[in-house]
Amino acid sequence: MADHEVYDAIIKLPIGKKPCTLTVVRNGDGTFDGEFTVLGSTAPVTNGKIDEEGNYTADCTITTILGTLEATTEGRIYDGKIDGVAKSRMGVMPIKSEELW
């Protein structure tokens, strides 16, 4: 298995701030695969792109107690932290490492 990076974070959902995890597996060509976990559900991260400064974009479709949600995400991964947003029909939801809140 390729090396993977795990980022524990907080996402601000309409129901409040909730813990989440993003797992990233860099493919070495500016793309990445991964998983996103929130509210006890895990889903694959698709179309992941990341540059040398850690700026990323990706897509995710996850089914939780809130229903099925399609989102595009963008932000930056740096110094072991994540600072980004997920954009979906529920609005823009910040995703940040706990120390960035």
Predicted regions and their residues:
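Central antiparallel beta-sheet cores of small beta-barrel/beta-sandwich binding domains
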Residues: 1-79, 83-101
